[in-house]
Amino acid sequence: MNNACLFAYNELNRRADSLKHADMGTTMVMASIEGNVVTIAHIGDSRCYILRKDGGLLYQTEDHVNRILGWETLSRCFFSYKSGNVIPDIIQLYLEAGDRILLCSDGIYKSIIPYILEERMMDNKLPEDILETFDFLCEKNGNDNYTAILACIE
């Protein structure tokens, strides 16, 4: 996971330099599943939620955000001209059949009330149908771009 993060970091910096976008920054969340173990890496305010079929929220990443005078600013991001702190948080968890993993940008969780987000994640539907519901809710309630990946563990 560390090697994948380092590779992505170096590639993003190379592209930003070649495009004269040295003032850019981004957030990142990723998951790698091997057997019944998931490794989550994240930095910034993109999130990972893991819900257990019978137990509710098992895990949620903690945003790297400062709130100053009502404004949110990233305290850490994946690469940025402002900060050398690009070390992601990494955690490993055991998965069970029925668990659901959502990787998403802030446009998702800022557009959908948390309990509705969790309820929809656990709907007895195909992942693409759940993501269509998220798409509808973000179009209706959101004002940011949004991206999501939903994995259902069998």
What does each model-identified segment do?
Residues M1-E154:
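PP2C/PPM-type serine/threonine phosphatase catalytic domain
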